[in-house]
Amino acid sequence: MTENIHKHRILILDFGSQYTQLVARRVRELGVYCELWAWDVTEAQIRDFNPSGIILSGGPESTTEENSPRAPQYVFEAGVPVFGVCYGMQTMAMQLGGHVEGSNEREFGYAQVEVLTDSALVRGIEDSLTADGKPLLDVWMSHGDKVTAIPSDFVTVASTESCPFAIMANEEKRFYGVQFHPEVTHTRQGMRMLERFVRDICQCEALWTPAKIIDDAVARIREQVGDDKVILGLSGGVDSSVTAMLLHCAIGKNLTCVFVDNGLLRLNEAEQVMDMFGDHFGLNIVHVPAEERFLSALAGENDPEAKRKIIGRVFVEVFDEEALKLEDVKWLAQGTIYPDVIESAASATGKAHVIKSHHNVGGLPKEMKMGLVEPLKELFKDEVRKIGLELGLPYDMLYRHPFPGPGLGVRVLGEVKKEYCDLLRRADAIFIEELRKADLYDKVSQAFTVFLPVRSVGVMGDGRKYDWVVSLRAVETIDFMTAHWAHLPYDFLGRVSNRIINEVNGISRVVYDISGKPPATIEWE
């Protein structure tokens, strides 16, 4: 019998902050399971979840507006600790009898909070001291409204010059509100405050660890599928690879992985996937060489969105054909992860539907009545990677840069041809190899090469040549929502350019993309 790793759990109610998923990831990093729900859940749903504590997230709305989001009143009647962050603090104050006002000045950026009163939330936590020995905390503020009167049974724990109630608390009820964001790294002691709330005040044990998550997933897979057969589309990406390893641990040869080689992968990627999962780990893999089929379906198509749809459609066709060849397969496994199933908290109806359906493989034939196995659906991407390491997958594979689902289909601009893909594969491999050699690979968030369907004159020896152009792209980003182009050293870029032009026959010019996001996107298509 495996340990119940969901025994202690935190419920996070999402009021729409850009940082809400970060709050959840921080709680998980503390070894405690949590779920992220839209703010307008019912009392029955909260009772059913039975949380050890509740966190109210930040959000873009103003509590002073008439129909702004509110926490269900039951949150404050459930008898568990509650932690309000930014908007979460404001709605807590309003709902419990305090007062919030719009402020003429937005407080955005660093602030120093002075701790005035002892509180379980911040006891012994400080960044520096005032002249008279009071603790100071360096925090990150991002708010317009502010609490102007706290509920009568609360005390002021900390303040700033422009924010009289930066932290408020009701120690008896274990209700806490902070006007700053403890989940962001700019709040230097934020993780310690979250740990204090989750581990000490809510008394949650650290049961949510990679080894225990694996044991739990394996037990749940066995319970769900029994002796039935399972099929999985293995791409070699992080999610499908970790899904494959978990299923292999749970059911061994009853798992069949289908690896569709679409001709749009990186250099030697198909061989690497087969070597690692087939030869090294001993998984049962069907290798389907389908390059010709994908390229002929893409012939003559220039539109990026149409190319994506074609690649998706052909993948489903090929996968379905392979699935139908297998006898007695009852289950389809997918690498769905937690962000895929979190619905935005901004529910237009005012009622939340927390889970949305998400299908990586798309429409399976009607005659294939299969159940769905999704062993990663509670996990964030960083947790999936940690589990992959625990399962023995190589670090370089788990932590490599993102690669788009359609592969080189959207990195060859315009029409996709085998000649273009072959040139691009080799040029891209040189760029990545040089980044690793120069110890720059992990310093950029994503790097790749793009094939441009334009010819350019070049000189080789005594002759002129008229060949293709590629662009190098490297960006630095935290969340991939915005990104800066990476300022790679000129001598490094020169070395990469020389190698590509000299070693890849058919490329005569290399350019470097210096566009940020926005206005450009990270991928060209």
UniProtKB/Swiss-Prot annotation:
<dbReference type="InterPro" id="IPR025777">
    <property type="entry name" value="GMPS_ATP_PPase_dom"/>
</dbReference>
<keyword id="KW-0332">GMP biosynthesis</keyword>
<keyword id="KW-0547">Nucleotide-binding</keyword>
<dbReference type="Pfam" id="PF00958">
    <property type="entry name" value="GMP_synt_C"/>
</dbReference>
<feature type="active site">
    <location>
        <position position="183"/>
    </location>
</feature>
<protein>
    <recommendedName>
        <fullName>GMP synthase [glutamine-hydrolyzing]</fullName>
        <ecNumber>6.3.5.2</ecNumber>
    </recommendedName>
</protein>
<dbReference type="InterPro" id="IPR017926">
    <property type="entry name" value="GATASE"/>
</dbReference>
<feature type="domain" description="GMPS ATP-PPase">
    <location>
        <begin position="208"/>
        <end position="400"/>
    </location>
</feature>
<feature type="active site" description="Nucleophile">
    <location>
        <position position="86"/>
    </location>
</feature>
<feature type="domain" description="Glutamine amidotransferase type-1">
    <location>
        <begin position="9"/>
        <end position="207"/>
    </location>
</feature>
<keyword id="KW-0658">Purine biosynthesis</keyword>
<dbReference type="InterPro" id="IPR022955">
    <property type="entry name" value="GMP_synthase"/>
</dbReference>
<dbReference type="InterPro" id="IPR029062">
    <property type="entry name" value="Class_I_gatase-like"/>
</dbReference>
<dbReference type="GO" id="GO:0003921">
    <property type="term" value="F:GMP synthase activity"/>
</dbReference>
<comment type="subunit">
    <text>Homodimer.</text>
</comment>
<dbReference type="InterPro" id="IPR022310">
    <property type="entry name" value="NAD/GMP_synthase"/>
</dbReference>
<dbReference type="Pfam" id="PF02540">
    <property type="entry name" value="NAD_synthase"/>
</dbReference>
<dbReference type="InterPro" id="IPR001674">
    <property type="entry name" value="GMP_synth_C"/>
</dbReference>
<feature type="active site">
    <location>
        <position position="181"/>
    </location>
</feature>
<comment type="function">
    <text>Catalyzes the synthesis of GMP from XMP.</text>
</comment>
<dbReference type="GO" id="GO:0005524">
    <property type="term" value="F:ATP binding"/>
</dbReference>
<keyword id="KW-0315">Glutamine amidotransferase</keyword>
<dbReference type="InterPro" id="IPR004739">
    <property type="entry name" value="GMP_synth_GATase"/>
</dbReference>
<dbReference type="InterPro" id="IPR014729">
    <property type="entry name" value="Rossmann-like_a/b/a_fold"/>
</dbReference>
<feature type="binding site">
    <location>
        <begin position="235"/>
        <end position="241"/>
    </location>
    <ligand>
        <name>ATP</name>
    </ligand>
</feature>
<keyword id="KW-0067">ATP-binding</keyword>
<keyword id="KW-0436">Ligase</keyword>
<dbReference type="Pfam" id="PF00117">
    <property type="entry name" value="GATase"/>
</dbReference>
<comment type="pathway">
    <text>Purine metabolism; GMP biosynthesis; GMP from XMP (L-Gln route): step 1/1.</text>
</comment>
<dbReference type="GO" id="GO:0005829">
    <property type="term" value="C:cytosol"/>
</dbReference>
